[in-house]
Amino acid sequence: RQLKNSKVTHSWIDRVRIEPASQPLIAPHIDLESKDNIYHALFYQLQIKASYTRSDKSQASEYILNPIAIIQRGVIIYLLATRTDDPDVIIRTFALHRFASVEILESAAQTPDNFHLDNYLDAGGMGFSHPLFSQLPDRGKHTAVELQFTKQAGKSLTESKLSDDQTVTINSDETLTIRATVNLTSQLVWWLRGFGSGLLDAKPALLYEAVLDKPINDAQRQ
């Protein structure tokens, strides 16, 4: 039904809100000229010469980049791009607030063959890899996980699934075992850490090690 009555419409607007699921953060400052040049280059499919400071470095480095796409995640805006000095043509993420300067070049940007943004996102491209998971096949993509929660901690996952193939088992001690197929990423690790003592165990073992941020042995498992 259409809300034709303006009074009713305003009443509805006054009664509906969207609250973020995570802690609200203030967006970092972005150099506006750099941002405009990145967007311009992306629109016209041109390469850029950029001065960029990585999160693990204190000094900026210069790169020639092929802009591919823009993605906003929370308050952070990222540029997907490849570096011209990378023979493997790896698609990398560059946070816009870390660009000190950007120059638009006349050379055409190159996009990897068969790249589709939706497919990239569906495959967990923005989940950010975790160093431990490099030991797993395909760096932990599409991995079967088993998570054991206290009854209270796991309750939300009985309502909102981790994956379409998720199953829930209620154990005799009233703990919950969740089985699902997911991409193992740093985002998953941070999310699981948020459960604190409510997360009792996780498999594969490397996932639980990443959550605890320390090696584990069989004796440490619940």
Enumerate the language-model features and the residues they cover.
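Loop-centered beta-sheet repeat module
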Residues: Y39-D86, I90-R92
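Well-ordered beta-strand positions
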Residues: A69-Q72, T169-I170, R193
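Surface-exposed, charged, gly/pro-rich loop-and-adjacent secondary-structure segments at domain edges
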Residues: L80-Q187
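A common structural junction motif
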Residues: D164-T169, F195-D201
